Amino acid sequence: MGKIIGIDLGTTNSCVAVMDGDKPRVIENAEGERTTPSIIAYTNDNETLVGQPAKRQAVTNPKNTLFAIKRLIGRRFEDQEVQRDVAIMPFEITKADNGDAWVSVKGEKMAPPQISAEVLKKMKKTAEDFLGETVTEAVITVPAYFNDAQRQATKDAGRIAGLEVKRIINEPTAAALAYGLDKGKGNQTIAVYDLGGGTFDLSIIEIDEVGGEKTFEVLATNGDTHLGGEDFDNRVINYLVDEFKKEQGVDLRNDPLAMQRLKEAGEKAKIELSSAQQTDVNLPYITADATGPKHLNIKLTRAKLEALVEDLVARSMEPVKVALSDAGLSVSEINDVILVGGQTRMPLVQQKVAEFFGKEPRRDVNPDEAVAIGAAVQGGVLAGDVKDVLLLDVTPLSLGIETMGGVMTTLIEKNTTIPTKKSQVFSTAEDNQSAVTIHVLQGERKQASANKSLGQFNLEGINPAPRGMPQIEVTFDIDADGIIHVSAKDKGTGKEQKITIKASSGLSDEEIQQMVRDAEANAEADRKFEELVQARNQADHLVHSTRKQLAEVGEKLSAEDKAPIESAVNELETAAKGEDKTEIDAKVQALIQVSEKLLQASQQQAQADAGAQQSQSTKGGDDVVDAEFEEVKDK
């Protein structure tokens, strides 16, 4: 059985880890970095770039460089949060036929799971390069507050990337695993404050040690799936745009190139202000008008940054209060606070968390790597490599069905430990009703329409009877991934209908299979592209070395020996500019064959040069003069 890798699929950055012996290990990518930007770019020559290479070219290709895709995964185009992103993202967010939020790249509509799969493929390849074997299984993390549609979409992304997702686990829970695995402190209750690039979670987790077995039990979780570092960046960008408009009278919002440069500069300034009190944002030639080029140079202080984002930090504290209340705990009962996610490096965030909990957060957890490490530990548990660890997670949102009057009747309360199963008996609302529609909902509101619709199905063939007489048993079953299965059974006839909840939108199995095939086809195209580049490089090297030899020893060849070599060099040079690898290989072989006499002449010249050098050194050896020396001792 191969290794089960752990992947933190982040909004801004992603990370992959694996159990190396009995210790989890974060794996460096091809660029030598421990985290990979969750950025995907589609270039003009149909190449797909992922990670740092995609980030580097973002300024010149803003419309086809996709980032923060996790904010769209499993969401409807009409969602308020998606509409906010539509207004600020440089790439085009569009409405899919099923109502989902998709992205349009070069006129082609793409689903968020399809795009996220590119990042997962990069993580898979990173792990394979390290392990030296094929990887087919993974544990992938999601924000604790992700709903069913978002979890399903993340699983779909894994399938498209060629991974069997063995488990979806919540990010704060994974961080707790990373923190608590080697802590021999017995029982303790911790709060995990996870403020990442696009999402925020707060989980209260109890770590118990009984007879050598560690149990990680989530008591409560809460969060905001549209609050994170990207929102902090946008505040900085908007401030810079407004200041520039005041100074220069030019609105940069209409210039995608300038906005992409501002995004990079804004993120860099925000990071610098975690350690410095002020920074300069300096972008020469940001734009131009009739009077000439314009330069942006704005000072940004830490105090100004904190004023810009104060309400975002305050917004993160609301779910903290709710989670504590749901867990039935007071602040004083929390033993440790762990910070996860890059945005928690901001001093204001650390200060507000410390003020709320009345204690300094822990500094011994890497906020960028803890989640991937925890996922790798869970992978080790599933593979049987890690013993004596039990993970008890919860469902973040209540689940129920719509009943008469448009009310949501809850079957499974939020923060119920999963996996779980719950049944309840309902009846008909009309006389002689022969079918019922089971409308499955997720959320905390009593009004059904105010909650997230997860899907609906019909139970037909109910025997005619007065209203309220038939007994229909509805059963909710949530698996360890937090994925929901619902069944409805007519106790009178024994007829039963079951579904695994597919988001009321979501991707169909056919669409996922097509995307898997596309991904495999792309992998083949990528392999061919790599082979073509290698062939071109070999051709360039051969052209260069042959021309060098011609310049050095060409006069020793006759004109009839020299002409075919020069002709073959020119033909190879032309072939190397084309797209046909077979032709390049053929021209390489042709040049090697006609260059035989040139190679001989070159070798003869090298031998002659070596002989001359040796005789010179022998001659020089006769001139060696013996010198007398006197040893001087320290007095």
From Swiss-Prot:
Top-level taxon: Bacteria
Pfam families given in the database record: HSP70 (PF00012)
Sample GO molecular function, one term: ATP binding
Family note: Belongs to the heat shock protein 70 family.
InterPro entries (UniProt xref): ATPase_NBD, Chaperone_DnaK, Heat_shock_70_CS, HSP70_C_sf, HSP70_peptide-bd_sf, Hsp_70_fam
Keywords, ordered alphabetically: ATP-binding, Chaperone, Nucleotide-binding, Phosphoprotein, Stress response
Function noted in UniProt: Acts as a chaperone.
Gene this protein is translated from: dnaK
UniProt keyword annotation of Chaperone present: yes
Residue span of region Disordered: 600-635
Record Gene3D superfamilies: 1.20.1270.10, 3.30.420.40, Actin, Chain A, domain 4 (3.90.640.10), Substrate Binding Domain Of DNAk, Chain A, domain 1 (2.60.34.10)
Disulfide-bond pairs as recorded: none
Residues bearing PTM Phosphothreonine: T199
PANTHER family registered for this protein in UniProt: HEAT SHOCK PROTEIN 70KDA
Protein name per Swiss-Prot or TrEMBL: Chaperone protein DnaK
Low complexity biased stretches: 600-617
Induction behaviour: By stress conditions e.g. heat shock.
Lineage of the species this protein comes from: Bacteria, Pseudomonadati, Pseudomonadota, Gammaproteobacteria, Pasteurellales
